[in-house]
């Protein structure tokens, strides 16, 4: 058992499968099945959002510790064909920081045809790569965007890059990377502009989802008494729009949806803290260093990279992955007494 850098939790090379049923898919002890794979491919980012990264950025992961494009393609292949994963999303950091992203997408598209390949991005620089990514096989993008006011955006991200983001969003739409969703983190600093952001999304024809801020900030300054809840947001949006509760599009979807002014447009709210959906979670996460993380808030990761580079075959890697998910917690525990946030920030884990 070894410990690695950046405050990463204990990394194990084996796990207990005691009591696990003899099935191929990624089932856990609470009956949940992981079908949605999030693959973080870098810790680097072109922005410095206050809730995600410190101003100086995250410590660089040594190049030899990062999964290569071919290694990621192989693990995605295993996840789909041996473990039952049905959707793959590439995250960061910022995925566009990888110069081999198109190669990675193309390799996955060839190995797992028909499986949706999505990406969460800040869209900085996307205008130059949207067409190539679409040709490689990328299906759609979610864009992280907390404000459409340039000055406010610069304060939140510590970078004046809103024009590039807007150009990237338009380029993605032209390239057919749809349906596109905008993700915005709920904070006191973003609440006043929430209605303006929704207005902009309605005009642009993209779906907006607000996400309650979780204790995953790099500076570890999150405090429950300062967080903006889903109920508070609904009250603010209700001053400008008529919102009608619409529920979830499927039980495992994290966002509760509301019709806006009678529909068909909707706005989603992911109330990760106040309305936890852990009991329906269907996600499994692969970090940029090649470890499986069963939950954003897990204190352990299972090392696939070492096994992969030591000659493990596909079934051996799949079995390690199954063990990681079998031991997934019942929930994130944010509301429990004695909760301790993970040392990894969201930027280091991958969204």
Curated annotation (Swiss-Prot):
GO biological process: Mo-molybdopterin cofactor biosynthetic process
Entry keyword Iron-sulfur: yes
CC cofactor note: Binds 2 [4Fe-4S] clusters. Binds 1 [4Fe-4S] cluster coordinated with 3 cysteines and an exchangeable S-adenosyl-L-methionine and 1 [4Fe-4S] cluster coordinated with 3 cysteines and the GTP-derived substrate.
Names of the cofactor(s): [4Fe-4S] cluster
Sequence positions that bind S-adenosyl-L-methionine: 51, 93, 144, 214
Family in the record: Belongs to the radical SAM superfamily. MoaA family.
Binding positions for GTP per the UniProt entry: 38, 89, 120, 181, 283-285
Binding-site positions, [4Fe-4S] cluster 1: 45, 49, 52
EC number: 4.1.99.22
Name of the protein described by the UniProt record: GTP 3',8-cyclase
Entry-linked SMART domains: Elp3
InterPro entries: Aldolase_TIM (IPR013785), Elp3/MiaA/NifB-like_rSAM (IPR006638), MoaA (IPR013483), MoaA_twitch (IPR010505), MoCo_biosynth_MoaA/MoaC (IPR050105), rSAM (IPR007197)
Molecular function terms from GO: 4 iron, 4 sulfur cluster binding; cyclic pyranopterin monophosphate synthase activity; GTP 3',8'-cyclase activity; GTP binding; metal ion binding; S-adenosyl-L-methionine binding
Pathway: Cofactor biosynthesis; molybdopterin biosynthesis
PANTHER family the UniProt entry points to: MOLYBDENUM COFACTOR BIOSYNTHESIS PROTEIN 1, MOLYBDOPTERIN COFACTOR SYNTHESIS PROTEIN A
Gene: moaA
Taxonomic lineage from the root: Bacteria, Bacillati, Actinomycetota, Actinomycetes, Mycobacteriales
Domain of life: Bacteria
Native organism: Rhodococcus opacus (strain B4)
């Amino acid at each position: 058992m070894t410990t690695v850098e950046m405050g990463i939790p204990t990394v194990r090379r084996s796990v207990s499968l005691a009591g696990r049923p003899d099935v191929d898919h990624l089932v856990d002890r609470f009956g949940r099945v992981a079908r949605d794979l999030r693959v973080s491919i870098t810790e680097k980012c072109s922005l410095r959002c206050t809730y995600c990264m410190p101003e100086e950025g995250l410590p660089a992961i040594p190049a030899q510790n990062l999964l290569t494009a071919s290694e990621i393609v192989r693990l995605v292949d295993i996840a789909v064909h041996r473990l039952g994963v049905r959707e793959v999303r590439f995250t960061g950091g910022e995925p566009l920081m990888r110069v081999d992203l198109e190669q990675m997408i193309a390799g996955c598209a060839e190995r797992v045809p028909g499986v949706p390949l999505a990406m969460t991005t800040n869209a900085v620089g996307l205008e130059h790569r949207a067409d190539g990514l679409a040709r490689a096989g990328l299906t759609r993008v979610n864009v992280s965007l907390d404000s459409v006011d340039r000055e406010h955006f610069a304060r939140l991200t510590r970078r004046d890059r809103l024009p590039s983001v807007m150009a990237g969003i338009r380029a993605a739409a032209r390239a057919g990377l749809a349906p596109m969703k905008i993700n915005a983190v709920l904070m006191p600093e973003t609440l006043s502009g929430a209605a303006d952001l929704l207005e902009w999304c309605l005009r642009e024809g993209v779906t907006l989802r607000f996400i309650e801020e979780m204790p995953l900030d790099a500076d570890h300054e999150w405090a429950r008494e300062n967080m903006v809840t889903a109920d508070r947001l609904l009250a603010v949006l209700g001053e400008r729009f008529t919102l009608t509760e619409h529920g979830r599009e499927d039980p495992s979807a994290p966002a509760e949806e509301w019709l806006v002014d009678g529909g068909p447009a909707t706005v989603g709210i992911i109330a990760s803290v106040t309305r936890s959906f852990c009991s329906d979670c269907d996600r499994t996460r692969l970090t940029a260093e090649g470890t499986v993380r069963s939950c954003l808030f897990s204190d352990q990761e299972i090392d696939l990279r070492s096994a992969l580079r030591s000659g493990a075959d596909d079934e051996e890697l799949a079995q390690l992955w199954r063990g990681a998910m079998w031991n997934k917690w019942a929930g994130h525990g944010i509301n429990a007494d004695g909760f301790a946030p993970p040392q990894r920030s969201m930027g280091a884990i991958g969204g």
